[in-house]
């Protein structure tokens, strides 16, 4: 069952949306503290987020920015505001759709279904295909598992590992990694990249895989299959 986080301060509308979506077997969760939306988001790990623009303390644009620093979860904006700049701003911040109030619930359900179908099918496709050095790489849970055990990586660590595995046995430059991270809205510096790669190796060492990530001095990194010791 998919979990939906509904960031809406209108209690009547929240109850209506929750009731309607529950009929379609969606679990809908609200926000108990509008100053701690990110904390609640991180704890819940929803499959999709619906955000109103006008909210207490900080507006929906603020929370969209914050969520995008942590996740690529699908986001739908709801708003009674009808100015084109609101829709443009939503899309620029990384929202997947914008629905103007008042709206028909069938439209909301259809958009949710379309987004989740697209995202779920895409991630499932990737999850089934990724193996490396006898380990299973799970794109949905950011985990790496083999006969030794299983570890969960941070978003950045997993992104770096994924990028290296996609080009295994080839050098991936530091600039390429940083650029890819920025394109995915994970803004890190050159020094931070080094820290993340070192952390990644340390975590992979728990599964006996740390040596499979090699440093190519002055060039970048390589995901190997032979396990030669890295620098």
From Swiss-Prot:
The modification 4-aspartylphosphate is found at residue 52. Keywords: Cytoplasm, DNA-binding, Phosphoprotein, Transcription, Transcription regulation, Two-component regulatory system. Phosphorylated by BceS. The keyword Signal does not apply. GO terms for cellular component: cytosol; protein-DNA complex. GO terms for biological process: regulation of DNA-templated transcription. Residues 127-225 bind DNA. GO terms for molecular function: phosphorelay response regulator activity; transcription cis-regulatory region binding. It comes from the Bacteria. It is found in: Cytoplasm. Residues 3-116 form the Response regulatory domain. Its main location: cytoplasm. Member of the two-component regulatory system BceS/BceR involved in the regulation of bacitracin resistance. When activated by BceS, binds to the upstream region of the bceAB promoter and up-regulates the expression of these two genes. This is Sensory transduction protein BceR.
């Amino acid at each position: 069952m998919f979990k939906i986080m509904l960031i809406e301060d209108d209690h009547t509308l929240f109850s209506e949306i929750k009731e309607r979506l529950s009929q379609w077997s969606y679990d809908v969760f609200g926000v108990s503290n509008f100053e701690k939306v990110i904390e609640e988001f991180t704890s819940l790990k929803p499959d999709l987020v619906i955000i109103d623009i006008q909210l207490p303390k900080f507006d929906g644009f603020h929370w969209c920015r914050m969520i995008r620093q942590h996740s690529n979860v699908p986001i739908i904006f709801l708003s009674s505001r009808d100015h084109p700049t609101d829709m443009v701003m939503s899309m620029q911040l990384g929202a997947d759709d914008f629905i103007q109030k008042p709206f028909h619930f069938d439209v909301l359900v259809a958009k949710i279904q379309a987004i989740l179908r697209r995202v779920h099918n895409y991630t499932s496709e990737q999850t089934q295909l990724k193996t490396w050095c006898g380990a299973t790489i799970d794109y949905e849970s950011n985990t790496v598992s083999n006969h030794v055990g299983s570890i969960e990586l941070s978003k950045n660590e997993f992104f770096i590992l994924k990028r290296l595995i996609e080009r295994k046995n080839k050098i991936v430059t530091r600039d390429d990694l940083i650029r890819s991270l920025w394109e995915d809205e994970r803004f890190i510096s050159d020094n931070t990249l080094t820290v993340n790669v070192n952390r990644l190796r340390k975590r992979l060492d728990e599964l006996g895989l740390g040596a499979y990530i090699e440093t190519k001095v002055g060039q970048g990194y390589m995901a190997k299959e032979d396990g030669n010791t890295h620098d």
